[in-house]
């Protein structure tokens, strides 16, 4: 609802009754001047308790959150979420009140964005529905599957370059899927948390602070998992030096995968690219490749083949 600051409470109530016939729910009462420029908002309690002869200019609240017609949907959603608003007024470039956006409108937008981000994280490159035709579904899914295919072929090619290592220590071959899986899982975890933080506008501070935090977290997780690998090796009678090699490789891979999963979404966001694309096959495939390379180079340094 919209009222003029020059009106009295009595005339305001009369006008509001007229406007109420055209709305299903009253979220807020906005106050404008004679040129329809937004001046503030009016509390229903203040309206009901004020004298009927009191002017609206004496009781309205001048502090009001608003957005312009050029404000992006994502920014509107963040503002309404931050201040817990049921509705927010919309003004044009001159400050004239042109409408409002309600929480119902934003909920629909958030739902659509969540569905899109989920599809991107799952490796679906465009918005599709389950009942779309085969052509549309194929076009949406195939690009990331092709990326995964080339990533897998790259891993095979890399493994071929370490024939000597696999001949000398065939046990390394059996731990390769474990290293690749841990790299992919850690990368997806890190990227998912960062993407969520970017969406909620809570990822703040310097890149250096984020770097120190992620390295510290990766060191803790990697050390615990590496220790479990060593204990497993001791339990099954595996060569201790091989267990240490695998444990150190896993620690290194977890650190690198965590950094990739953290900073790729941040960099994409700063470049104006949707960071959600970094949470799925892209992170998994890249971390698989880096993980395998790192695994065998560390094994080469320790085992000396």
Residue ranges and their predicted role:
Residues 1-174:
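Cytosolic regulatory modules rich in charged/polar residues
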Residues 289-290:
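Active-site His/Glu-centered metal-binding helix of metallohydrolases
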Residues 6, 113-251, 255-259, 263-277, ...:
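Alpha-helical transmembrane segments and their membrane-interface boundaries
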């Amino acid at each position: 609802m919209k009222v003029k600051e020059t009106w009295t409470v009595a005339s305001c109530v009369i006008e509001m009754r007229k406007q109420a016939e055209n709305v299903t729910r009253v979220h807020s009462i906005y106050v404008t001047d004679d040129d329809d420029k937004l001046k503030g908002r009016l509390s229903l309690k203040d309206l009901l308790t004020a004298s009927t002869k009191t002017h609206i200019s004496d009781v309205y609240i001048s502090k009001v959150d608003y957005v312009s017609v050029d404000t992006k949907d994502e920014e509107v959603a963040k503002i309404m979420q931050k201040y817990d608003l049921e509705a927010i007024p919309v003004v044009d470039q001159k400050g004239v009140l042109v409408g409002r956006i309600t929480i119902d409108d934003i909920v629909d937008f958030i739902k659509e964005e969540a569905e899109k981000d989920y599809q991107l994280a799952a490796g679906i490159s465009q918005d599709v529905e389950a009942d779309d035709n085969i052509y549309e579904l194929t076009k949406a899914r195939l690009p990331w599957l092709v990326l995964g295919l080339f990533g897998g072929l790259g891993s095979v090619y890399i493994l071929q370059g370490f024939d000597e290592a696999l001949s000398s220590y065939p046990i390394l071959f059996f731990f390769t899927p474990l290293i690749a899986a841990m790299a992919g899982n850690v990368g997806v975890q890190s990227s998912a948390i960062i993407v969520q933080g970017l969406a909620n506008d809570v990822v703040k501070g310097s890149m250096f602070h984020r770097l120190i935090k992620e390295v510290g977290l990766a060191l803790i997780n990697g050390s615990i998992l590496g220790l479990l690998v060593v204990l497993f090796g001791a339990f099954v009678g595996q060569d201790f030096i091989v267990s240490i090699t695998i444990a150190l490789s896993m620690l290194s891979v977890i650190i690198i995968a965590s950094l990739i999963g953290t900073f790729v979404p941040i960099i994409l966001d700063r470049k104006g690219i949707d960071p959600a694309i970094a949470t799925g096959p892209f992170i998994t495939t890249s971390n698989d490749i880096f993980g395998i390379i790192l695994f065998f180079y560390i094994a080469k340094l320790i085992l000396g083949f």
